Regions:
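Generic detector of well-ordered alpha-helical packing
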Residues: 51, 55, 74, 93-96, ...
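Residue-level signal for inorganic ion chemistry
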Residues: 27, 50, 61, 97, ...
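Oxyanion/phosphate-interacting regions
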Residues: 1-18, 186-190, 204-278
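Glycine-rich active-site/cofactor-binding loop and its immediate structural neighborhood
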Residues: 85-124
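Acidic beta-strand-loop-alpha-helix segment within the catalytic core
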Residues: 111-206, 254-278
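N-terminal subdomain of lithium-sensitive/metallo-dependent phosphomonoesterases centered on the IMPase/IPPase/PAP
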Residues: 1-94, 182, 186-189, 247, ...
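Conserved acidic residues
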Residues: 68, 86-88, 120, 194, ...
Length: 278
């Protein structure tokens, strides 16, 4: 559908959005029928919704981007070694499986294209919220009101996304509902006052991209497919996703088995520069 240098083309972003929307519809069908969870070898939960969504996404990506390598969470669970080309695609078919199982609405479909170690475009779809956030470094980010299964061309509402710098007072801090750890709690003490906003999945990145939050620290290990799409949306909206040392998170790191030791998502460069190394 496109050459490697054209990953931000609107037609490709729409095609990726349609794939995410189709996967969202499959997830919602499983939710309506009652999801049954089981544990993977790493003790994390998986459901038939994860697998149904992944099958739709992989088939769709093979159709619109033939020959581009894909690393997807459920397929990756079957291997201990990775071969990552450049460019490649990172997929989490159902981010926030715990939230999904518990009946919450904060679970997402994540798709990101990675080139030269950074996400250049990404889709975060929240099936239960009827929302898709998408971003490309060449064109910016936007939020679409898009119920599961609806094509991008039929979106009823589109809003451009721009982060907002911290405006003083309490820091609006997104924190993980399922993975909050003591190291993250300690990191947050650098701010004199915080307004905690508990949330699951990649929705946390998107709230910062919308200007509704200021920072999201995660000092525990996570996988690249968990955060790449959120990074794409936030970075294209004016934010940053950095290591605690202030460097951009790099993707395709096979020496770490595609794990990210820790990161902090920021609303803007000035705030990151001021507080990253406090």
């Amino acid at each position: 559908m496109t050459n490697h240098g054209d990953f931000a083309h609107p037609s490709l972003l729409n095609a990726m959005t349609d794939i995410a929307s189709q996967a969202a519809a499959a997830i919602m069908r499983v939710r309506e029928n009652g999801a049954v969870a089981r544990l993977k070898t790493d003790s994390s939960p998986v459901t038939e919704a994860d697998e149904a969504a992944e099958a739709i996404i992989l088939e769709g990506l093979a159709r619109i981007l033939p020959g581009i390598g894909v690393v997807s969470e459920e397929a990756a669970a079957q291997t201990e070694t990775f071969q990552v080309p450049d460019p490649f695609i990172l997929v989490d078919p159902l981010d926030g499986t715990r939230e999904f199982i518990e009946g919450r609405d904060e679970f997402t479909v994540n798709i990101a294209i990675i080139q030269n170690g950074r996400p250049i475009s990404g889709i975060v779809g929240a099936p239960a919220l009827g929302t898709i956030w998408r971003g490309a470094m060449a064109s910016g980010s936007e939020r679409l009101h898009l119920p599961a299964g609806v094509a991008a061309k039929d979106a009823k509402d589109r809003s451009p996304l721009h982060t907002s710098a911290h405006r003083g007072g309490a820091w609006r801090a997104m924190v993980s509902r399922s993975h909050l750890d003591p190291a993250t709690e300690a990191w947050l003490t650098r701010f004199s006052a915080i307004e905690r906003m508990d949330c699951g999945s990649s929705v946390k990145f998107c709230r910062i991209a919308e200007g509704k939050a200021d920072v999201y620290p995660r000092l525990g290990r996570t996988s690249e497919w968990d955060i790449a799409a959120g990074d794409a949306v936030l970075s294209a909206a004016g934010g940053l996703v950095l290591t605690p040392e202030g460097e951009p998170v790099r993707y395709g790191q096979v020496a770490r088995n595609l794990k990210v030791p820790s990161f902090v998502a920021w609303c803007g460069a000035a705030d990151a520069a001021k507080y990253s190394t406090v």
